[in-house]
Regions:
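Membrane-embedded transmembrane alpha-helical bundles that form the catalytic cores
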Residues: 1-472
């Protein structure tokens, strides 16, 4: 079940909110846990058991970790390693088994001997909830949080349906207090509804519309590759993935507020970044901070000299690529960013920060490289990715433009213009300025949100099913 579906919007969501609010406070976590299991099991009930196994392992090992972390650190570390290995092992098995089998089978002695496991599919959201579970075990070992004694409350944390499928990755210590006591108010609920609606509109009205344009441009480029088509493909996908993923995050944060939770932000206008380093402070913030805290810093971070720092960065970005998927294009995507970030760390960042002109160049640098990176990210066949990237610079094309792509550009220019503006903070700033200067215009916000909701619902009902991109990770 996904947020942008009729069964969720008109069935599961209102029913869940009704059940949640009629329940006494003391059993609301139980209600959330059971509702989240129903939400998760709607699409693939067999994998509910996989998630419950991971929850049970982390919950049970949490007791000895918390008990021995001070009196017997070695024993606590044993239980930590057991928890991490079992949970990470589940992720590795389901996500990467067939990838490694298929690649090992390319070696002549193993060709025909190794066969992919039939019927092995990836449990939805396993990459996200595994990282959440690991954050609990690691933080508990470090003494950053306390042992959760309630299986129901811990299960509710892991399975919480607003962020179960595609994040944000919520660290346990960021919500441990909220699991016990959280505030509910009309203002908080209405804020959640507004945030959910904004995300829903971003996903349906902009993200899905851009996805359709991108798919069409891909077919055009395969037949008649031109430089303009390549650039339009990069632009539409760059905007599409932002509105799709940030839209989901907005919806998750909004849903969380409706039931009293406050999740950390996952995006901060990433396409305004002044460098690739800055971009990764703004894009998928929960994933970047997770790798920084649980991989990069434990490896030594930037404390052991530049060569070791580059090694640590390489490990992080190799894992980041693999986390996104069991395919070589994701590995290359991670390596691509490692190389760029290493160059920035070595000397480019200082140059970008020299003056206004170099900062502007840094912004252009970031936008072009991010767009190129998205082509690697989207194409599992690397030759197709390289063809589009080469086409951006006139390599392998039949010219700069064609009548077909010229017509498509004129047809989609309003969508592209609205999308570019919506990817910046300007709409929010203009609205805030209007509300502060003319208080009567405060009514404009709910009206616009209501219109956006109706338009998005109409588009969703009349359109085809389009799951979130990060749904598959």
């Amino acid at each position: 079940m996904v947020f942008s579906s009729t069964i969720f919007l008109f069935g599961f969501l209102p029913l869940s909110l009704l059940i949640y609010y009629v329940m006494p406070m003391r059993i609301r976590n139980l209600a959330l846990f059971l509702l989240s299991l129903v939400f998760y099991g709607f699409g693939e009930p067999t994998y509910v058991a996989v998630m419950l196994f991971s929850v049970t392992v982390a919950y049970l090992t949490g007791f000895p970790i918390g008990k021995y972390r001070e009196s017997n650190p070695k024993k606590a570390k044993f239980w930590l390693i057991l928890s991490v290995c079992l949970n990470l092992g589940m992720l590795l098995f389901f996500k990467y088994t067939n990838f490694f089998i298929e690649n090992l089978a390319l070696i002549p002695p193993l060709s025909g001997v190794l066969e992919p496991m039939e019927g092995l599919t990836l449990p939805i959201g396993i990459s996200f909830y595994t990282f959440q579970i690991m954050s609990y075990s690691i933080d508990l070992y470090r003494g950053s949080t306390d042992t959760q004694k309630s299986f129901v409350s811990f299960g509710a944390y892991v399975a919480l349906f607003p962020q179960l499928i595609a994040g944000p990755i919520v660290r346990y210590r960021d919500v441990d207090d909220q699991l016990m006591t959280r505030t509910h108010s009309v203002d908080k609920f209405s804020s959640g509804v507004s945030r959910f609606t904004v995300g829903f509109a971003k996903k349906i009205l902009l993200g899905d519309s851009l996805a359709a344009v991108y798919a069409y441009l891909g077919t055009v480029y395969a037949v008649e590759p031109t430089t303009l088509t390549a650039w339009l493909m990069v632009l539409t996908y760059t905007l599409h993935i932002y509105f799709d993923f940030s839209g989901y995050s907005d919806m998750a944060i909004g849903l969380g507020r409706m039931i009293g939770f406050e999740f950390l932000e996952n995006f901060n206008y990433p396409y305004l970044a002044s460098s690739i380093t800055d971009f990764w402070r703004r894009w998928h913030i929960s994933l970047s901070s997770w790798f920084r805290e649980y991989v990069y810093i434990p490896l030594g971070g930037n404390r052991k000299g530049l060569p070791r720092q580059f090694f640590n960065m390489g490990v992080v970005w190799l894992l980041t690529g693999f986390w996104h998927g069991a395919s070589w294009n994701f590995v290359l995507w991670g390596v691509f960013y490692f190389v760029i970030l290493a160059l920035e760390k070595a000397f480019l960042l200082k140059w970008f920060e020299k003056n206004t002109a170099t900062r502007a160049l840094g912004h252009i640098w970031a936008l072009i490289l991010v767009g190129m990176g998205w082509m690697i990210f989207d194409h599992t066949t690397l030759s197709e990715a390289f063809a589009v990237i080469g086409g951006m610079f006139g390599l392998g094309t039949v010219g700069f433009a064609s009548p077909t792509v010229g017509y498509e550009l004129s047809r989609t220019l309003p969508l592209l213009a609205v999308s570019v503006i919506a990817a910046t903070p300007f709409p929010a700033r203009i609205m805030a300025k209007l509300e502060s200067s003319r208080p009567r215009l405060a009514v404009l916000r709910p009206v616009l949100i209501g219109v956006a909701l109706l338009l998005a619902m109409a588009y969703m009902v009349s359109g085809t099913f389009s799951p979130f991109l990060y749904f598959i990770f």
